[in-house]
């Protein structure tokens, strides 16, 4: 963080501490329809036009440490195979054989020098190219180059693996914009995966997400974190601490 950023942060904290009303020219926002959180049709639209066109965190390099290691990721409605092609590169494909659509990978994690469909034995390399099929003599005028696995766009942010189902999507760096440079201080390339937990919540995904985007609930839910000087406490920056800013 350079001096200009430090001064800007101090000015913002000072402004927020003194503020007694909404910021000037703050727009009047409409109420959100309740169906945005309950309607299946709206959720289906989100999956189609949001999740399929966004960069999604799919894993960590520590989960596929060796060349040929793979992970089956199925968190967005489309099972994806993440493959450690080399030390620096990861490839990603839909978990669907180009012959009859059978799943190629069944286990969540594994390692193999090639990807083999267990149904009819079609075989693919780590780039998704079809490199072998059983009884090739029975396939007349067959072009193997047209039968590669369907790719999923994949990029690394340090040791973090991100995927995007939209092959024409802008790069992860372009998508993050100015945030990309700001988050470099976290040094994702030096972070190791120690453990991970999965929690299933009986709510729409936006309910869980928004709970981590606002502090309006802190006084009620996290009362042990709330002090008499909460207005100032909430404006602090604890570098290296376990704080949500």
Description of each model-found segment:
Residues 226-233:
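Conserved small/polar residues in nucleotide/adenosyl-binding loops
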Residues 1-96, 100-107, 152-156:
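N-terminal pre-ligand scaffold of iron-sulfur
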Residues 237-245:
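Hydrophobic alpha-helical segments, chiefly the membrane-spanning helices
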Residues 150-222:
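Extended catalytic-interface subdomain
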Residues 63-167, 173-180:
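Rieske [2Fe-2S] iron-sulfur-binding domain
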Residues 223-226, 242:
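Short, low-complexity export/processing leader segments characterized by acidic and small residues
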Residues 60-63, 220-224:
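A short, aromatic/hydrophobic, helix- or strand-capping loop or linear motif
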């Amino acid at each position: 963080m350079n001096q200009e950023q430090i001064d800007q942060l101090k000015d913002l904290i000072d402004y927020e501490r003194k503020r007694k009303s909404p910021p000037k020219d703050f727009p009047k926002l409409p109420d959100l329809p309740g169906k945005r959180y309950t309607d299946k049709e709206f959720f289906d639209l989100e999956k189609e036009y949001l999740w399929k066109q966004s960069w999604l965190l799919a894993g960590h390099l520590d989960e596929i440490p060796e060349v040929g290691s793979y992970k089956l990721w199925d968190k967005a409605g489309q099972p994806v195979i993440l493959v450690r092609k080399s030390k620096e590169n990861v490839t990603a494909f839909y978990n669907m054989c180009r012959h009859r659509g059978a799943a190629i990978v069944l286990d969540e994690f594994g390692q193999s020098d090639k990807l083999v469909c267990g149904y009819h034995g079609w075989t693919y390399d780590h780039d998704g190219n079809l490199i072998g099929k059983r009884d090739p003599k029975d396939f007349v005028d067959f072009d193997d180059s047209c039968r590669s696995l369907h790719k999923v766009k994949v990029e690394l942010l340090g040791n973090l693996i991100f995927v995007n189902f939209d092959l024409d999507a802008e790069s992860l760096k372009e998508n993050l914009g100015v945030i990309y440079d700001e988050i470099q201080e976290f040094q994702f390339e030096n972070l190791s995966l120690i453990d991970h937990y999965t929690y299933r919540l009986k709510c729409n995904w936006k309910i869980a997400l928004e709970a981590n985007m606002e502090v309006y609930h802190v006084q009620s839910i996290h009362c042990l974190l709330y002090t008499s000087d909460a207005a100032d406490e909430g404006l602090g920056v604890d570098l290296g601490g376990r704080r949500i800013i």
